[in-house]
Amino acid sequence: MIVFGWAVFLASRSLGQGLLLTLEEHIAHFLGTGGATTTMGNSCICRDDSGTDDSVDTQQQQAENSAVPTADTRSQPRDPVRPPRRGRGPHEPRRKKQNVDGLVLDTLAVIRTLVDNDQEPPYSMITLHEMAETDEGWLDVVQSLIRVIPLEDPLGPAVITLLLDECPLPTKDALQKLTEILNLNGEVACQDSSHPAKHRNTSAVLGCLAEKLAGPASIGLLSPGILEYLLQCLKLQSHPTVMLFALIALEKFAQTSENKLTISESSISDRLVTLESWANDPDYLKRQVGFCAQWSLDNLFLKEGRQLTYEKVNLSSIRAMLNSNDVSEYLKISPHGLEARCDASSFESVRCTFCVDAGVWYYEVTVVTSGVMQIGWATRDSKFLNHEGYGIGDDEYSCAYDGCRQLIWYNARSKPHIHPCWKEGDTVGFLLDLNEKQMIFFLNGNQLPPEKQVFSSTVSGFFAAASFMSYQQCEFNFGAKPFKYPPSMKFSTFNDYAFLTAEEKIILPRHRRLALLKQVSIRENCCSLCCDEVADTQLKPCGHSDLCMDCALQLETCPLCRKEIVSRIRQISHIS
């Protein structure tokens, strides 16, 4: 929800300000006046009342008064056609620009309040984005993120990702300058070990850039010094949160095949084998490190002779789990199918394997990270729009509990609840009563009033479901082990009634799944949509015949020519 609303605002705001600037120029020409003009709203503001220490205006005045053009263009806007955007939000009081550190901390303070797509981004986010439109400003923003984001704030790394993801792409010169400023190597990783926030933030920045610049730019960014720095951060002497984000950064660098080969040659798998033993550690920071280490060993940095986790995990008592075939593309799911984590910049979602249509049902979630997650119930009609920021609770077919922002979500609208913010180790309970048509949410056994809005759109076909913001993780209990806070009323559990075959329980690593896809052969006469059934149906009046009858019955227009389908004729009979 946050990312999509922020992107829409920037697009509309840039267009509106360009039109207003053009209008001002024509008015000034018509009246025969010059100089600064005053406008209202969130467009350009008058220089006379914008503050004498406005650094952007000062730079522009110096450039205009200079008789000799400067050869250094790093402080100039990257898009000279687009007018400068100096507007504040329409409700923001006029004030002098703060320093970058203050703006970053302001953004961190208000990030929990950004909940709706039509909500104005705060002044701090707008200003930071404007600063980052030049190389010099972008470098200032990045250094500030490393310098001031505190270790203890659970949304700190997510704010780093959010701000960098929405800033303009850095130029090659800016990236080169950043590597020179940071000057990272193994020795730097050992410095300031008593202040791990700087190293955590540095790794988070590197990971975000690696994800955003996958390809040649990512290869150039992973210098020998940066690789040495990240590997040094994985040593057991490091703070667990530093280890976690160094590992995530290496994962994101490995999205580029050349980087993956370089990292694999560093014997990283030997270090990860030690760290994967933390996957069930009672310390929730170490547990995150263990989860990511195990996932990397299974999916990215394979170790010769090591058995993949899915081949040895005991699933005999598990009859319901997270569905690896009903999940957005970047969510990580554990081999036992009951734990999930998101390290992408998108809003990743998943449903479980079991659907309920009647009765009273209950499941629990253990909070591993205390950031933004929307967990609850969803039908098959609920859509996963991860890149647009929509997840569970963001349509009329789902309802979700958000313990970080203390909200209940339904149909992309939120309302506050009275529970305190959740924290690591908390247990959230989810009760679905289809007899009374109500949902009840619990935090450590304390229940909220029932929620009934979703039943105006649907009354059956519910799955347990969840959506995750960046760097969030939780564990699900569908009844395979005793609940910590079972409700007083009689209920059923997924694990008592669900059934999965041994094959359906397997959650394959991505390289194994890709290998299976490469082995799939598609017949010449198969349906062009499902690639499963024989293409035996002709559409009228257009005459196209590349579909099976099952797919043709679901269409109103031909997918090839877009003509309306009047009738469907089966051409041949076949044995499926």
Swiss-Prot record:
UniProtKB keywords: Glycoprotein, Metal-binding, Phosphoprotein, Secreted, Signal, Zinc, Zinc-finger
Leader sequence residues: 1-16
Polar residues composition bias: residue spans: 57-68
Phosphoserine modifications at: 50
ZnF region ranges: RING-type: 527-562
Biological-process GO terms, alphabetical: proteolysis involved in protein catabolic process
Entry GO terms, CC: cytoplasm; extracellular region
Domain B30.2/SPRY: 300-483
Region feature Disordered, mapped onto this chain: 50-99
InterPro entries in alphabetical order: ARM-type_fold (IPR016024), B30.2/SPRY (IPR001870), B30.2/SPRY_sf (IPR043136), ConA-like_dom_sf (IPR013320), RNF123/RSPRY1-like (IPR045129), SPRY_dom (IPR003877), SPRY_RSPRY1 (IPR035774), Znf_RING (IPR001841)
Superkingdom of origin: Eukaryota
Localization of this protein: Secreted
Stretches with biased composition (Basic residues): 83-97
Residues bearing attached sugar chains per UniProt: 314
Primary location recorded for the protein, binned into one broad class: secreted
GO molecular function: ubiquitin-protein transferase activity; zinc ion binding
Protein name according to UniProt: RING finger and SPRY domain-containing protein 1
